[in-house]
Amino acid sequence: MNALPSSAEFSRAVGGDAVSREAVIRIEHLSKTFSDAAGPVLDDVSLTIRRGEIHGIIGRSGAGKSTLVRCINLLERPSAGRVIVSGREITSLRGRALRNARRDIGMIFQHFNVLSSHTVAGNVALPFKVAGLPRAEIARRIPPLLELVGLAHKADAYPSELSGGQKQRVGIARALALDPSVLLCDEATSALDPETTDQILALLRDINRKLGLTIVLITHEMHVVRDIATRVAVLDHGRVVEEGATFDVLAFPKSAVARSFLSGLVAHELPPPVAAQLLPAAVPGSDPVLRIVFTGTAAHDPIVADLVSVFGIQPNILHGRIDYVGDRPLGVLTLVAGGAGEKLPAVLSHLSSLGLVVEVIGHAVRSAVARRHSAAR
């Protein structure tokens, strides 16, 4: 492996405006149909992944995530459409040309695929041997890889002596052996416990920063996307239903699929017993229910106290949470604006002027919601 770039070199490589807009992977109108499937597994998927991004692709089981990532390096050949990686149309290649192109695309999997009969160093050496590198060159290049993934002290260990996280580190080192510019991660943390998952995500983030590596991360776990991805695409029934900066998708999800993934992570959705009490329109004795999204410094402002002191509102908090996406705070608060009445337009205008995103999501008879909310707790 080449020497790691300095921070200045890495900044020039992935930080400039011109380069950061460069598309490393372009997926154009991609479709895939299997002979035994009722319909297309992928249906007219288009996606652009830029240099240095960690791009998450999330979806339910069967959404087509793994098929999509396997089409990027042509482990699965698409039925229609194009995949372009680093300026080369991968889908037009076969034989030796395809094998050479794949050297620029590393891949790790949910199951670690380490050979039990080989040591850690022996497993990492495999891509070098397939590429025909001399033995001395292989011996020179293995130690920096093991150092990068935190396994320098395990070079002579066998897989039976390793934890699951250490086996995945072997997989990462092996995937990076031929200096790829792209790393595909297909459910790479799904078989790991939460603590080990966090460690592997931290390693991937570190590798992304040090090497300027573009990472495509397939997962069904939104917290993985929250913790590491710069952008995210939401896949459902073989189609991209939403795509954007991770913070924007988490803060302002547009699709029902994204909102369902966020239900345990960001408080966009009310608990079902409370949601069941909401009315679609105002009735006598009801109050508006507001969902307020806080971002940046507004996530820490005393908004509820402000509503009481400025407008005399009697707020009843139904649900809320503050989380962090990267280093940016994101809060979602749902409350009944008790006594808002004719003051509601002024309340909404005031909250908007503070940089908050606010919407009326329904109405509620306060006493009924309070009773049900108390029971739900």
UniProtKB/Swiss-Prot annotation:
Which gene name belongs to this protein?
Answer: metN2
Which EC class heads this enzyme's classification? translocase
Whether ATP-binding counts among this entry's keywords is: yes
The protein's assembly and partners = The complex is composed of two ATP-binding proteins (MetN), two transmembrane proteins (MetI) and a solute-binding protein (MetQ).
The record's similarity note reads:
Belongs to the ABC transporter superfamily. Methionine importer (TC 3.A.1.24) family.
Membrane topology type: Peripheral membrane protein
What Pfam families does the entry give?
A: ABC_tran (PF00005), NIL (PF09383)
Organism the protein comes from? Rhodopseudomonas palustris (strain ATCC BAA-98 / CGA009)
- Name which cysteines form disulfide bonds: none
Residues at which ATP binds? 59-66
* GO terms of molecular function: ABC-type D-methionine transporter activity; ATP binding; ATP hydrolysis activity
**Sorted alphabetically, which keywords does the UniProt record give?**
Amino-acid transport, ATP-binding, Cell inner membrane, Cell membrane, Membrane, Nucleotide-binding, Translocase, Transport
Entry EC no(s): 7.4.2.11
Classify the source by domain of life: Bacteria
Major localization listed first in the record, in broad terms:
membrane
- PANTHER family assigned to the protein according to its UniProt record, in alphabetical order: AMINO ACID IMPORT ATP-BINDING PROTEIN, METHIONINE IMPORT ATP-BINDING PROTEIN METN
| GO CC, alphabetical | plasma membrane
All copies of the ABC transporter domain together span: 25-262
Supply the name of the protein.
Methionine import ATP-binding protein MetN 2
